[in-house]
Protein backbone atom coordinates (compact mmCIF):
# COMPACT_ATOMS: atom_id res chain seq x y z
CA UNK A 1 0.00 0.00 0.00
CA UNK A 2 2.70 2.52 0.99
CA UNK A 3 4.80 1.95 -2.11
CA UNK A 4 1.70 2.40 -4.23
CA UNK A 5 0.81 5.65 -2.44
CA UNK A 6 4.33 6.97 -3.03
CA UNK A 7 4.15 6.00 -6.69
CA UNK A 8 0.84 7.81 -7.11
CA UNK A 9 2.19 10.97 -5.46
CA UNK A 10 5.23 10.79 -7.73
CA UNK A 11 2.93 10.33 -10.75
CA UNK A 12 1.00 13.41 -9.64
CA UNK A 13 4.21 15.44 -9.50
CA UNK A 14 5.28 14.21 -12.94
CA UNK A 15 1.86 15.14 -14.32
CA UNK A 16 2.09 18.58 -12.73
CA UNK A 17 5.44 19.20 -14.41
CA UNK A 18 3.62 19.16 -17.77
CA UNK A 19 1.59 22.16 -16.53
CA UNK A 20 -1.93 20.78 -17.09
CA UNK A 21 -5.04 22.68 -15.96
CA UNK A 22 -6.04 19.87 -13.60
CA UNK A 23 -4.79 16.48 -12.45
CA UNK A 24 -7.48 13.81 -12.70
CA UNK A 25 -7.24 10.54 -10.77
CA UNK A 26 -9.07 7.75 -12.57
CA UNK A 27 -10.62 5.46 -9.97
CA UNK A 28 -13.15 4.38 -12.60
CA UNK A 29 -11.20 2.14 -14.98
CA UNK A 30 -12.91 -1.27 -14.94
CA UNK A 31 -10.41 -3.15 -17.14
CA UNK A 32 -9.42 -6.44 -15.54
CA UNK A 33 -5.64 -6.01 -15.62
CA UNK A 34 -6.05 -2.64 -13.87
CA UNK A 35 -8.95 -3.22 -11.46
CA UNK A 36 -7.91 -6.81 -10.72
CA UNK A 37 -4.73 -5.62 -9.01
CA UNK A 38 -6.61 -3.08 -6.95
CA UNK A 39 -6.04 -0.05 -9.18
CA UNK A 40 -8.65 1.94 -11.13
CA UNK A 41 -12.11 0.92 -9.96
CA UNK A 42 -10.46 -1.81 -7.87
CA UNK A 43 -9.93 1.01 -5.37
CA UNK A 44 -13.65 0.99 -4.63
CA UNK A 45 -13.05 -2.10 -2.50
CA UNK A 46 -10.64 -0.16 -0.28
CA UNK A 47 -12.20 3.24 0.35
CA UNK A 48 -9.77 4.29 3.12
CA UNK A 49 -6.83 3.67 0.76
CA UNK A 50 -8.59 5.53 -2.05
CA UNK A 51 -9.25 8.53 0.21
CA UNK A 52 -5.76 8.52 1.71
CA UNK A 53 -4.11 8.32 -1.70
CA UNK A 54 -6.22 11.20 -2.96
CA UNK A 55 -5.37 13.27 0.14
CA UNK A 56 -1.66 12.74 -0.44
CA UNK A 57 -1.87 13.77 -4.07
CA UNK A 58 -3.94 16.87 -3.25
CA UNK A 59 -1.28 17.86 -0.70
CA UNK A 60 1.64 17.10 -3.03
CA UNK A 61 0.56 19.22 -6.01
CA UNK A 62 -0.59 22.80 -6.49
CA UNK A 63 -2.93 22.10 -9.41
CA UNK A 64 -6.59 21.29 -8.73
CA UNK A 65 -7.08 17.53 -8.33
CA UNK A 66 -10.25 15.91 -9.67
CA UNK A 67 -11.44 12.31 -9.41
CA UNK A 68 -13.38 10.02 -11.72
CA UNK A 69 -15.00 6.95 -10.24
CA UNK A 70 -17.98 4.58 -10.42
CA UNK A 71 -21.04 3.90 -8.24
CA UNK A 72 -19.25 1.14 -6.34
CA UNK A 73 -17.63 -2.26 -6.83
CA UNK A 74 -20.88 -4.18 -7.35
CA UNK A 75 -24.65 -4.05 -6.69
CA UNK A 76 -24.13 -4.79 -2.98
CA UNK A 77 -21.61 -2.02 -2.44
CA UNK A 78 -22.78 1.14 -4.19
CA UNK A 79 -20.88 3.42 -1.83
CA UNK A 80 -20.52 6.50 -4.02
CA UNK A 81 -22.47 8.79 -1.67
CA UNK A 82 -20.02 8.13 1.16
CA UNK A 83 -17.03 8.26 -1.19
CA UNK A 84 -18.08 11.63 -2.62
CA UNK A 85 -18.23 13.23 0.83
CA UNK A 86 -14.92 11.75 1.91
CA UNK A 87 -13.15 12.84 -1.27
CA UNK A 88 -14.60 16.32 -0.91
CA UNK A 89 -13.23 16.39 2.66
CA UNK A 90 -9.68 15.73 1.46
CA UNK A 91 -9.83 18.60 -1.00
CA UNK A 92 -10.72 17.43 -4.51
CA UNK A 93 -11.94 20.18 -6.86
CA UNK A 94 -14.61 18.16 -8.73
CA UNK A 95 -15.92 14.61 -9.04
CA UNK A 96 -16.95 12.70 -12.16
CA UNK A 97 -19.20 9.69 -11.57
CA UNK A 98 -19.79 6.91 -14.11
CA UNK A 99 -23.26 5.46 -13.53
CA UNK A 100 -22.25 1.80 -13.34
CA UNK A 101 -20.49 -0.45 -10.85
CA UNK A 102 -17.16 -2.10 -11.63
CA UNK A 103 -18.94 -5.46 -11.87
CA UNK A 104 -21.14 -4.12 -14.68
CA UNK A 105 -18.14 -3.03 -16.78
CA UNK A 106 -20.06 -1.31 -19.63
CA UNK A 107 -23.06 -3.67 -19.65
CA UNK A 108 -26.64 -2.63 -19.07
CA UNK A 109 -27.73 0.97 -18.83
CA UNK A 110 -25.94 3.56 -16.75
CA UNK A 111 -27.90 4.40 -13.59
CA UNK A 112 -27.89 8.14 -13.08
CA UNK A 113 -30.18 8.18 -10.03
CA UNK A 114 -27.26 7.84 -7.61
CA UNK A 115 -25.33 10.52 -9.52
CA UNK A 116 -28.34 12.79 -8.96
CA UNK A 117 -28.43 11.86 -5.27
CA UNK A 118 -24.81 12.87 -4.83
CA UNK A 119 -25.35 16.12 -6.72
CA UNK A 120 -28.43 17.03 -4.72
CA UNK A 121 -26.92 16.24 -1.32
CA UNK A 122 -26.76 19.67 0.41
CA UNK A 123 -23.42 18.68 1.98
CA UNK A 124 -21.80 18.39 -1.46
CA UNK A 125 -20.24 21.68 -2.55
CA UNK A 126 -17.92 20.56 -5.36
CA UNK A 127 -19.05 20.27 -9.01
CA UNK A 128 -20.47 16.85 -9.89
CA UNK A 129 -20.01 15.64 -13.47
CA UNK A 130 -22.17 12.79 -14.75
CA UNK A 131 -20.88 10.13 -17.14
CA UNK A 132 -22.45 7.10 -18.80
CA UNK A 133 -24.33 6.47 -22.06
CA UNK A 134 -24.41 10.08 -23.28
CA UNK A 135 -24.37 9.80 -27.06
CA UNK A 136 -26.35 12.83 -28.27
CA UNK A 137 -27.36 16.40 -27.50
CA UNK A 138 -30.88 15.41 -26.39
CA UNK A 139 -29.44 12.80 -24.00
CA UNK A 140 -27.06 15.38 -22.50
CA UNK A 141 -29.91 17.87 -22.09
CA UNK A 142 -32.05 15.21 -20.38
CA UNK A 143 -29.28 14.46 -17.86
CA UNK A 144 -28.73 18.14 -17.04
CA UNK A 145 -32.46 18.69 -16.59
CA UNK A 146 -33.26 15.53 -14.70
CA UNK A 147 -30.30 15.29 -12.33
CA UNK A 148 -28.99 18.85 -12.11
CA UNK A 149 -25.36 17.84 -12.68
CA UNK A 150 -22.77 20.57 -13.23
CA UNK A 151 -21.34 18.92 -16.33
CA UNK A 152 -21.48 15.77 -18.43
CA UNK A 153 -18.55 13.69 -19.60
CA UNK A 154 -18.67 11.75 -22.86
CA UNK A 155 -16.59 8.60 -23.32
CA UNK A 156 -17.29 5.73 -25.72
CA UNK A 157 -19.59 7.82 -27.94
CA UNK A 158 -16.51 9.74 -29.10
CA UNK A 159 -15.07 6.72 -30.94
CA UNK A 160 -15.08 7.58 -34.61
CA UNK A 161 -17.22 10.58 -33.80
CA UNK A 162 -15.05 13.33 -32.31
CA UNK A 163 -17.52 15.94 -33.57
CA UNK A 164 -19.98 14.78 -30.89
CA UNK A 165 -18.79 17.64 -28.66
CA UNK A 166 -19.74 20.17 -31.33
CA UNK A 167 -23.08 18.38 -31.78
CA UNK A 168 -23.90 18.36 -28.07
CA UNK A 169 -22.89 21.99 -27.52
CA UNK A 170 -24.94 23.07 -30.54
CA UNK A 171 -28.01 21.23 -29.24
CA UNK A 172 -27.64 22.63 -25.71
CA UNK A 173 -27.36 26.16 -27.12
CA UNK A 174 -30.03 26.01 -29.85
CA UNK A 175 -32.19 22.91 -29.36
CA UNK A 176 -31.32 21.84 -32.92
CA UNK A 177 -29.76 18.54 -33.91
CA UNK A 178 -26.81 19.15 -36.24
CA UNK A 179 -26.61 17.20 -39.50
CA UNK A 180 -24.02 14.42 -39.48
CA UNK A 181 -20.74 15.21 -41.31
CA UNK A 182 -20.52 13.97 -44.90
CA UNK A 183 -18.20 11.10 -45.84
CA UNK A 184 -15.69 13.60 -47.28
CA UNK A 185 -15.70 15.58 -44.03
CA UNK A 186 -15.25 12.39 -42.02
CA UNK A 187 -12.25 11.43 -44.13
CA UNK A 188 -10.61 14.83 -43.53
CA UNK A 189 -11.26 14.63 -39.79
CA UNK A 190 -9.98 11.03 -39.67
CA UNK A 191 -6.77 12.05 -41.47
CA UNK A 192 -6.17 14.87 -39.02
CA UNK A 193 -6.93 12.51 -36.12
CA UNK A 194 -4.47 9.92 -37.48
CA UNK A 195 -1.75 12.56 -37.94
CA UNK A 196 -2.16 13.72 -34.34
CA UNK A 197 -2.14 10.16 -33.04
CA UNK A 198 1.12 9.42 -34.89
CA UNK A 199 2.67 12.66 -33.68
CA UNK A 200 1.72 12.12 -30.04
CA UNK A 201 1.98 8.32 -29.71
CA UNK A 202 4.54 7.39 -32.36
CA UNK A 203 4.25 4.91 -35.24
CA UNK A 204 3.26 1.64 -33.61
CA UNK A 205 1.04 2.77 -30.72
CA UNK A 206 -0.32 5.69 -32.73
CA UNK A 207 -1.70 3.27 -35.32
CA UNK A 208 -2.88 0.57 -32.91
CA UNK A 209 -4.84 3.10 -30.85
CA UNK A 210 -6.45 4.59 -33.96
CA UNK A 211 -7.96 1.32 -35.16
CA UNK A 212 -11.11 1.36 -33.04
CA UNK A 213 -11.62 5.01 -34.02
CA UNK A 214 -11.07 4.54 -37.76
CA UNK A 215 -13.45 1.59 -38.02
CA UNK A 216 -16.13 3.63 -36.23
CA UNK A 217 -15.78 6.73 -38.41
CA UNK A 218 -17.46 4.94 -41.29
CA UNK A 219 -20.09 2.76 -39.61
CA UNK A 220 -23.09 2.24 -41.85
CA UNK A 221 -21.38 2.55 -45.25
CA UNK A 222 -22.52 -0.19 -47.66
CA UNK A 223 -20.04 -2.82 -48.91
CA UNK A 224 -17.42 -1.53 -46.52
CA UNK A 225 -16.15 -4.81 -45.06
CA UNK A 226 -12.95 -5.07 -47.11
CA UNK A 227 -12.03 -1.43 -46.54
CA UNK A 228 -12.78 -1.71 -42.83
CA UNK A 229 -10.41 -4.67 -42.64
CA UNK A 230 -7.66 -2.48 -44.13
CA UNK A 231 -8.30 0.25 -41.56
CA UNK A 232 -7.82 -2.19 -38.69
CA UNK A 233 -4.86 -4.15 -40.09
CA UNK A 234 -2.61 -1.80 -42.09
CA UNK A 235 0.54 -0.62 -40.33
CA UNK A 236 1.98 1.76 -42.93
CA UNK A 237 0.69 5.32 -42.37
CA UNK A 238 0.91 6.11 -46.10
CA UNK A 239 -1.28 3.12 -46.94
CA UNK A 240 -3.76 4.21 -44.27
CA UNK A 241 -3.92 7.74 -45.68
CA UNK A 242 -4.40 6.31 -49.18
CA UNK A 243 -7.20 4.05 -47.89
CA UNK A 244 -8.91 7.05 -46.29
CA UNK A 245 -8.67 8.99 -49.57
CA UNK A 246 -10.16 6.03 -51.43
CA UNK A 247 -13.15 6.11 -49.05
CA UNK A 248 -13.84 9.72 -50.03
CA UNK A 249 -13.58 8.77 -53.72
CA UNK A 250 -15.78 5.69 -53.53
CA UNK A 251 -18.41 6.70 -50.96
CA UNK A 252 -18.26 10.49 -51.35
CA UNK A 253 -21.82 10.68 -52.67
CA UNK A 254 -23.31 8.36 -50.06
CA UNK A 255 -25.94 10.12 -47.95
CA UNK A 256 -24.98 9.62 -44.30
CA UNK A 257 -27.90 11.61 -42.90
CA UNK A 258 -29.90 8.43 -42.38
CA UNK A 259 -27.03 6.52 -40.81
CA UNK A 260 -27.48 6.15 -37.09
CA UNK A 261 -24.22 6.94 -35.28
CA UNK A 262 -22.36 3.86 -34.12
CA UNK A 263 -24.00 2.31 -31.06
CA UNK A 264 -21.98 2.50 -27.87
CA UNK A 265 -19.54 -0.36 -27.90
CA UNK A 266 -19.32 -2.44 -24.73
CA UNK A 267 -16.01 -3.86 -25.87
CA UNK A 268 -13.67 -1.32 -24.31
Regions found by a protein language model. Name each.
Residues 60-62, 76-94, 106, 113, ...:
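Alpha/beta catalytic cores of nucleotide-metabolism and tRNA/nucleoside-modifying enzymes
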Residues 9-39, 48-126:
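Alpha/beta enzyme core
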Residues 44-45:
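Aromatic- and acidic-residue-enriched carbohydrate-binding clefts of CAZyme catalytic domains
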Residues 3-4:
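Short, small-residue-biased leader/transition segments that mark boundaries at the very start
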Amino acid sequence: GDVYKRQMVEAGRIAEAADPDIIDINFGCPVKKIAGRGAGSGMMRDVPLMVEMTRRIVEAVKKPVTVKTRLGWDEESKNIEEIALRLQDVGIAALTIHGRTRAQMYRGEADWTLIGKVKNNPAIRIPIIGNGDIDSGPKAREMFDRYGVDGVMIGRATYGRPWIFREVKHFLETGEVMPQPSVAERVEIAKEHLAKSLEIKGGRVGILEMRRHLSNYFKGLPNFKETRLKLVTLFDPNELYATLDSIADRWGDFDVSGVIPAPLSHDV
